[in-house]
Design a protein with these regions (language model features):
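N-terminal nucleophile
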Residues: 1-240
């Protein structure tokens, strides 16, 4: 389970503000956010890297492309499915949507959000679970309190993405998985176990895109039981 919240052209200083928590088994090898080149891709990607699958869960480019994904829980995971993480990496390709349509049965179920940072249209969704609603309310409150000033991405992450409050069991959705496991996953920040394997929030990220094209990528990631901070800034390259 991952969770995201964003605001598009709703702040006087930012075109986009995005929050994202990635939840994964702690044993899965992962690199923190950095610039890296994926095989066969033209642009470098800024984002973390899943060393097992080779992809990412949240990535952006200097050319203004941004993509992230969240998983959809399935009672029986697909055997031999390709990694979802390759999708944000491939999102900028020509004819990519046709390739995805042809390969959709080979990839585990997920929700993929794509942004072209110089466009004016934003994605939307209608089915919101309790922790998403909770994060949305907290995010709106944070923005209302900082509507005339530059936003601290670190403060935004620490105040909003570390919330461990779980949903009331009466509103936990029925997704077909074990209800007790569903309950464990009902907070914004997750820290639990599945059998003997520790599972939970591995990284918390915030991206701020200012109106002048300055992009800041803030990440707080967990490695060897320690939380590490990482900040990358760059100027978005405008299309000629």
């Amino acid at each position: 389970m991952c969770i995201a919240a964003w605001t598009w052209q709703a702040h006087p200083a930012y075109g986009l503000l995005l929050l994202f928590n990635r939840d994964e088994f702690h044993s899965r090898p992962t690199r923190p956010a950095q610039w890296w080149a994926a095989a066969g891709e033209g642009e470098e990607i800024l984002g973390g890297k899943d060393e097992l699958g080779g992809g990412t869960w949240l990535g952006c480019t200097k050319g203004g492309k941004l993509a992230f994904l969240t998983n959809v829980r399935e009672p029986s995971p697909r055997v031999g499915a390709r990694s979802r993480g390759e999708l944000p990496v491939r999102a900028g390709r020509v004819h990519w949507s046709m390739q995805l349509k042809l390969q959709r049965k080979q990839i585990s179920t997920m929700v993929l959000i794509l942004y072209w940072l110089m466009c004016v249209q934003e994605p939307w969704c209608t089915s919101l679970i309790s922790q998403v609603l909770r994060l949305g309310q907290s995010f709106n409150g944070f923005l209302a309190a900082h509507d005339d000033a530059e936003v601290s991405l670190k403060q935004m992450v620490e105040e909003l993405m570390t919330d461990t409050v779980k949903a009331d069991r009466s509103v936990v959705p029925d997704t077909g998985v074990d209800p007790d496991w569903e309950y464990e996953l009902s907070s914004i920040f997750i820290d639990t176990k599945k059998g003997q394997a520790r599972y939970g929030t591995r990284s918390m990220a915030a991206i701020g895109v200012k109106l002048d094209g300055e992009v800041t990528f803030y990440e707080k990631s967990l490695a060897s039981s320690l939380w590490n901070e990482n900040v990358v800034q760059f100027e978005m390259e405008m299309a000629q």
